[in-house]
């Protein structure tokens, strides 16, 4: 049976080799190594959370890492921009996310790809606020937090039609076996193509993701909320926006005609959602034309002075060193008890915590040794004996504790 499985893997790999040039295969190997560099002990299970931004994916990534970091390697990616950020060749070989997914499958890995659907208006709002500082206003979050809310709403409405509403599951995965209707009983879709398992979730079911993923992945998954905009420096402005915003009538009509909303929400869910915005509807708004939007984006990108790519914004970045694993166990225990997770597992911080614990233990031990030596010296003095030789504390070697 094992021989048969190895033969299948070999066939996958040979077929993959025949698909690309030798130069591209080398580039794939290099890029894949960089993508997995957070995991010093690669396992045979890899999950690509490959979806649009602002759909709840950061929560999903951190939850899987926190629950099963040693069983699953998790790669979070929205598009090929990440490849250029971590590769010296700026993706000159035109490697796509699909290439990396199929490459890992050709290596014999169990590969999962996850996408998430989020209700359209909320997704557009979150996407806008994700780049409101670095792109749209090119100002610090602290200063933007003081902006007049009408100014921010006007900018958002001008951009509304152009803010993404893409569906990776249908548009990017190349699946030909997508069901005609969403599985409203199971609350997810699971399709397989080229040996890769593709999963579609809904953000509205986030409270059920733990059970859903436990069933699909075959290991317990606990969901922890991560990277919520209303807890960022822009929290005041964001919450004010959510409480103030009323959707223009022409925008709401476009949402009513949204095919993704009609597919991922059943009739009752869709009606409830639309009614929630119908009560907050205003007159039509004339947004930017396509030409105006193109000019706007060109100008914003030329003026941009901040880096949009974010680092270490997850609760768990997936490092498997002893220090990070120890911190992970503590946070997972909190999550299982239903406690809110407010800390992050960042390697340098986890290492410092371990060092702090060891230093405290060393200080306590040294104090005890000093006290024992003091008592011995007092006893020897009473008995007129020569002083005992001091005891030296051998400090712990941190190389045995963490991977630096």
Annotated model-derived regions:
Residues 1-13:
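N-terminal amphipathic/basic-hydrophobic helices that include classical n-h-c signal peptides
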Residues 12-404:
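Membrane-interface amphipathic segments in extracytoplasmic regions
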